[in-house]
Amino acid sequence: MKPIRALAAGLFLAATPALAVDIGDDGLHKPAWLRETFKDLREDLAEANAEGKRLLIIVEQRGCIYCARMHEEVFPDPEIDALIRDGYFVVQMNLFGDVEVTDFDGTALPEKDMAVRWGVMFTPTMIFLPEEVPEGKTAAEAAVALMPGAFGKGTTSALLTWVRAHGYENGEHFQKFLARQLQEQD
C-alpha cells in the first residue's frame, strides 16, 4: 500500500506546478486576466469602459499568504474566473511597490504611498470602481466597494456579481445580498 501512496503523492506534486499561478519578479501572483498598464487610473477606467468591464484594483504584497489563498483556491474556480474575465478590467498594485500610480484626481505617487493615501492596510484588498468617477475624487473616495482580506468562493462570487449588477445602487447592502444568495442556494 505504501508504494501506491508514494506514487499518488508524487503524481500530485508533479501536477501542482501546472495548476499554480505565475509569480512575477515583484513576488506577486500574475493570473492571465491581470492587465499590464501604466497605472494611470483615468486611462484604465476609460479602457475598462470601452471593453464594457468594471475597473477593479487589487492591492497585494510579496509573501502574502492570504493573496496566495485567493490566487490558488478562489480565483481559479471556473465560475469566479469567468466572472473576472468577462466583467472586470483588473489592475494590480503592490502595497510596498515603487511603480508610479496616477489617481483619478491627477495625483501621482509610488504604489506604496498611494496605498497609504487610500488607507489600504491589508492584503489582498479589492477596490471596485464605478464606471464614472466624479472629478476631484480619489479611487478610495469613488469606490463602490472595498474588500479587504481573503474570502471564500461564495462571498467573492457574490461580491463580483453584486458590483457588476450595480447592487450598491438599489439600496440592498452587500451583506443582505449575500444572505439572500445563500438562502436561494438552500
Report residues per predicted region:
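Non-catalytic, surface beta->alpha helical segment in thiol-disulfide oxidoreductase systems
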Residues: 116-170
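A short beta-strand-turn-helix
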Residues: 36-55, 84
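Bacterial N-terminal signal peptides that target proteins for export
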Residues: 1-8
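Sec/Tat signal peptide C-region and signal peptidase I cleavage site
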Residues: 16-20
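Short active-site neighborhood of thiol/selenol oxidoreductases, capturing the structured segment around
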Residues: 51-65
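Conserved redox-active cysteine motifs that mediate thiol-disulfide chemistry
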Residues: 61-75
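Thiol-based oxidoreductase modules, predominantly thioredoxin-like and allied folds used
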Residues: 77-109
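N-terminal "domain-start" segment that seeds a small globular fold
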Residues: 21-45
